[in-house]
Amino acid sequence: ALTGSWVLAPEAAALKVGPAAGNGDWWSNSEDDVTTRSCLFDDHYVFNADGSFQNVQGDQTWLEPWQGSDPEACGAPVAPHDGSNPATWEYDAASGEVTLTGLGAYLGLPKAVNAGELSSDNPPPVPESVTYTATLEGDMMTLVIECGTGVFWTYKLVPAQTAMVSTPFGNDDFRTLVEMMPRDSGPWDWSGYDSISFSYNNTVAQSIENRVHV
């Protein structure tokens, strides 16, 4: 069920951190963050059927001070969290654990690892593997990782083929349901803004790196 391409659910509290799993008392993203951090919310986490894993970020992702960006902003992915190293994934259905093996491979946020949070001030080393607890319910995957002791990050992921995105249009924000299909397997069918609907068909085969960013 994990096989495929996933993205962060474009909604409030898709990313949150607190003293327990599923808790966002310390911080959680807002709806506005979905737009501000669009370079993060369009990142793909790809679980291939052959057991390989890919972080597909395109030209930009969200960078934090520990990665050299102060203040936080969109920027070019920084190694080793740029998908440049080969990685694999393994899912233990009995325990619900998902393990990524490969330097820099991650889900959600690269700074959250099992030993703690990566930082510019005395961070733990970047690990060769990271383990998350995954819960699958419908088309939603909820991931939890405890960073060190008592710090829990929770992420909500949805299949990349179907995502709800907040799209600026004029002076208003509309919630637009976007049915997204990889171009090399068929047409993209987009429902439109507010009462306007349209579809876009592209017959040119393209890879996931060349996907349309909304």
Task: List where the protein language model places each region.
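Contiguous, well-ordered beta-strand patches that form the walls/edges
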Residues: 12-17, 32-139
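Beta-rich carbohydrate-recognition modules and glycan-binding surfaces
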Residues: 1-25, 29, 94-101, 145-147, ...
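C-terminal or internal capping secondary-structure element at the end of a domain, subdomain, or sheet
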Residues: 128-160
